[in-house]
Amino acid sequence: MKLHSQFLKLQSHFGGATEISVTMDELALIFGCTHRNAMHIVNKMMLQEWIKWTPKRGRGSRSLLQFLVPSEEIALQSMMQAISRKDVHNAIEGIKTHASSTSLQDTLQGWLLTYFGHHSEIRSDKQIDTLRLPITQQLHTFDPLYMNLLAESFVSSHVFDGLVKRSGEQDKIVPCLAHAWEVDESRTLWTFFLRKEVLFHHGKVLTAKDVVYSLGRLMQTSKRTLYSYIFKEIQRVTALNPSTVQITLKQPNELFLPFLCTSRAAIVPRDLEGMDEQSFGRRPVGTGPFKVVDMTEDTCVLEVFPYYFQGRAHLDRVEILYVPWDTETSSSDTGSAFHVIQNPSSASSSTWSRIHSESSIRKFVTCNTQKKGPLSDPLLRAKIVSCLKDDSASIEQEAIIDQEITLQISTIPQYAGDADFIATRLEQQGYKCNVISVSPEEFKGPIRLESDLIVFSLFRDEDEQLRLFDLYLTLSQHIEPHTRADIEGWLYTIAREPNPVARAESFSIIENRLIKEHHLHILYEKPTQTAYLPSVRGVSFNSQGWVDLRHVWFPPLLSSSSTS
């Protein structure tokens, strides 16, 4: 690998020339080594027949160096060696280094894809099935209290369970850790009856005290997290006996039971089994079908939990790797490319079979009218929002402003491209823009109230109503008082409406009001997809539109010679 890198560094230094005149001292400077070591490197490259070296006698004399192979070939060899060693990180770094060559990048990505997908081997007459998945979001924690990313929620959904869950059929909520539940007439006293002998990954039995601890962590946190408006409505949680939990709400909230289906409400062992929160987030202990056995900056490894109370998963091992380039564009038929891949490109090969989940992502921009500035003027706000519409090219010249206005646009790194698009459209109409991109954690802070425009997204899945409630509650903090009062009134009604259809109608009223008053502008919406090859069996979705790995399986190997 080192010799490969030295060759690529050398050729890059001379701009891809095929023949150069150079001294050994100059080569030593390029390699960052001694004159003697530079000679060794040159000799090694000659033995590999990568270069031809015609020396000139005398120290300081300029010798002739000819490159016999293109850099693409050496880069490919280097990446292949990294992949064969399962050194995905170095393989990816190599691809990023040579990203300027489209053909090389496509070739290297195609080879890297052979690492992902389904891999089976026979051990002690048993087929061991491993699924390797690439993700484009770096994983930080699986602690239900601290998760921010959808990819983290995806892993968490296979490591933890909640008291209840969604069935995926007609928005129905069904038992999970609790086999039954009751609610009193006031809709504030909820009683959950736990299954017996449910095991955590470390072998301890789940009890009501674990539920009390898990919900208590949410109640006591000072962090502003997704769905905090729900769990802050919990007045107390009581363990009536080892298998019965009673939850008292401060006031009725029909979104409480749906909230208990989310990964935020997952049940963890009490006191986190003595671990600090950071350690627990990277090596969590849950009751789910898979357990985390390893986690680094780039890799998360799950192994099946054979004693899962709802039945053992078919897969034995899942390796999830952070891949910081777009894997969607590489779907060539390499013989063992992706079997399961999130968000496939619409240009993917026709050999891929596709199914669609019901989830989608909506990108939007909101206006902060609480901040003293141009957006507090309804007419100017309308002009600014009109610049973002598809037909903005036809805006009359009078829309061009005659005074200098600078707008601050805030977002998170994942949506920086959308923020830049907005800035470009506005700058075309004479507005100056300053885009600020901060981490999801910082985004929850004062940065939003200091900005004029805020770019974010709504993940539309079976938890959409929970997300909408959170979204509109947040938006109400930076809009005019009279509109805020109306929104808070609608949200109060929604929280007490048991019919999800009626709740959806109220959410639509809020959306239409915000759009009409130019507080909200929807940029676009696109569906999420899952592509799979015919060899995959049991593909189904959880409530967030992710593939449920517990049900995925592959046909058995016909013989040991079929291993990959």
Annotate each PLM feature.
Residues 138-152, 204, 256-263, 531-550:
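A structural "hinge/loop" feature
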Residues 303-306, 354-383, 387, 491-493:
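A bilobed periplasmic-binding-protein/Venus flytrap-type ligand-binding module shared by bacterial periplasmic
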Residues 16-20, 41, 148, 180-224:
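Aromatic- and charge-enriched surface segment that lines or borders ligand/interaction sites
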Residues 56, 113-117, 386-398, 413-422, ...:
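Detector for C-terminal structural segments
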Residues 307-349:
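Ligand-site clamp/hinge motif
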Residues 134-183:
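N-terminal lobe/hinge region of extracytoplasmic solute-binding protein
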Residues 370-430:
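Append "and occasionally in soluble cytosolic enzymes with long acidic Gly/Pro-rich linkers
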Residues 63-64, 228-272, 294:
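Surface-exposed binding/hinge segments that line
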